[in-house]
C-alpha cells in the first residue's frame, strides 16, 4: 500500500514485487520504499505489461465520475426520496438504476455531493447499510452547482500521472535517476544497481540458486491458487492474460 501509516511496518523487508503497474510514480516510490528501511540490501521488481494499465484506468474512472454522472445520481435521489427526503438504497441499486458501468464512481459522486452539502449519509438503524438524506430537496438537478473545470483538471492530472508511470517503465535511463528527476532533483546520479544500469549483466542466464528456486515455486503456487479449472483447462481468476 502507498497509504501512510498502513501496510507492513517492518524495517527488514528484503523483497517487494509489483505484480501490476501502480497508478503513479508517487505510489510506486512509496510502495517500493517499504524495502530495505534498515539500510541493508533489498530488491524491488516491477512486472510490467502495458495491458495492465487498463486496471489503473478503471480506478481513474472510478474516482472521477464526471459532472454528468453526479447529476444522474442526484436526480436518482430526487426521484426516490420519501417524505423525509431520505433514500434507503444501496450503491449497487443506484448503479443499476442510472446504468453506470463503474460502481466506484457512484461512491465518488456521493462524496462530491456531500462536500457540496447537497446530501448527507446516515446509518440506518438495525442495519449495516447507510441511507442518504437530501439537505436541499428544493434544488433541482439542473440547478446543482458543480465545478466541472475542477473535476476535469483532477482527471487530467490522474491520467498524466499514470502516463508518467508508463514512461518510467519504458525508460532506458537509470530508474533511480529518472525518479529523482521526476521529483525535481537536478543532475541526479545514476544508481548503478537497477536493470538499466546493470546493462548486459542483467540479461545473463544462469541456473537459479536453491533459495531463488524456492521463491519461484512459492510464487507460482500462489498463482495456481488464484486459478480455477474449466472445461478447457486452468483459467486465472486474477491477472488473466498477464505476463508474469
Question: What residue spans do the PLM features occupy?
Answer:
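C-terminal helicase lobe
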Residues: 2-4, 8-244
Amino acid at each position: 500500500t502507498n497509504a501512510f501509516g498502513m501496510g507492513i511496518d517492518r524495517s527488514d523487508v528484503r523483497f517487494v514485487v509489483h505484480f501490476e503497474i501502480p497508478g503513479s510514480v508517487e505510489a510506486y516510490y512509496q510502495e517500493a520504499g517499504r524495502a530495505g528501511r534498515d539500510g541493508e540490501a533489498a530488491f524491488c521488481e516491477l512486472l510490467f505489461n502495458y495491458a495492465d494499465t487498463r486496471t489503473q484506468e478503471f480506478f481513474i474512472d472510478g474516482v472521477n465520475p464526471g459532472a454528468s454522472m453526479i447529476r444522474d445520481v442526484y436526480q436518482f435521489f430526487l426521484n426516490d426520496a420519501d417524505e423525509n427526503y431520505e433514500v434507503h438504497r444501496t450503491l449497487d441499486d443506484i448503479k443499476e438504476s442510472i446504468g453506470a458501468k463503474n460502481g466506484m464512481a457512484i461512491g465518488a459522486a456521493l462524496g462530491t455531493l456531500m462536500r457540496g452539502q447537497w446530501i448527507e449519509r446516515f446509518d440506518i438503524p438495525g442495519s449495516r447499510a447507510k441511507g442518504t438524506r437530501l439537505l436541499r430537496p428544493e434544488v433541482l438537478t439542473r440547478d446543482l452547482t458543480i465545478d466541472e473545470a475542477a473535476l476535469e483538471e483532477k482527471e487530467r492530472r490522474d491520467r498524466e500521472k499514470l502516463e508518467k508511470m508508463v514512461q518510467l517503465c519504458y525508460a532506458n535511463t537509470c530508474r533511480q535517476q529518472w525518479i529523482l528527476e521526476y521529483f525535481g532533483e537536478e543532475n541526479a546520479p545514476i544508481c548503478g544497481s537497477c536493470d538499466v544500469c546493470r546493462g548486459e549483466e542483467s540479461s545473463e542466464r544462469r541456473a537459479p540458486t536453491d533459495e531463488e528456486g524456492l521463491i519461484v515455486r512459492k510464487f507460482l503456487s500462489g498463482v495456481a491458487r488464484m486459478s480455477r479449472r474449466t472445461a478447457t483447462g486452468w483459467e486465472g481468476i486474477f491477472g488473466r492474460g498477464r505476463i508474469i
